[in-house]
Amino acid sequence: MKGIEMKIKIGIIICDRYRRCAGGKCLRSMRNREGAFSIYADTEVELVGFTTCDGCPGGNIEYAGEEMVKNGADAVHLATGMIVGYPPCPYIDMFKAFLEKRYGIKVVVGTHPIPTKYLDMHTHLGTWEDDAWKPLIAPTMADEVTRESYD
């Protein structure tokens, strides 16, 4: 509604392969409401947690979800790195389903837009040809200029 300020608190879970990532692309896209954060166009966003899954098969998912909910998270984003890394996370569907069921929280696959270099490589490899990937990558697809700005 116009005139009413809305606020959402989110947590971000990244792939453990990127545990040393400073989170710059995720935070930039959150600030600019790009990629999967475009759904919050007119909403104030507060980050209440940022951690890794703890590596395959995701030993930290249960704890991270619980901690984020305790910190007030309304939604958890599974970082774009989980879908653009090679290979993409084989547990992403399981993580999403678990967090939604266990904590009754909204789970969004993706953070920043898929960089062009990753889109090109995964297109070449056919990684995302299976129809199951379409809804997973959709929130992080963006126009070409935006994708290139995340290369």
Where are these regions (language model features)?
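Short beta-alpha junction loops
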Residues: 80-84, 111-116
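Short, acidic/small-residue loops that bind anionic groups at enzyme active sites
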Residues: 97-114
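Conserved mixed alpha/beta catalytic, RNA-binding, or beta-rich assembly cores of soluble enzyme
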Residues: 6-68, 88-91, 113, 119-123, ...
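Mid-chain, well-packed structural core segment of small domains
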Residues: 62-93, 97
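Short, Lys/Arg-enriched N-terminal segments with co-localized hydrophobic residues
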Residues: 1-5
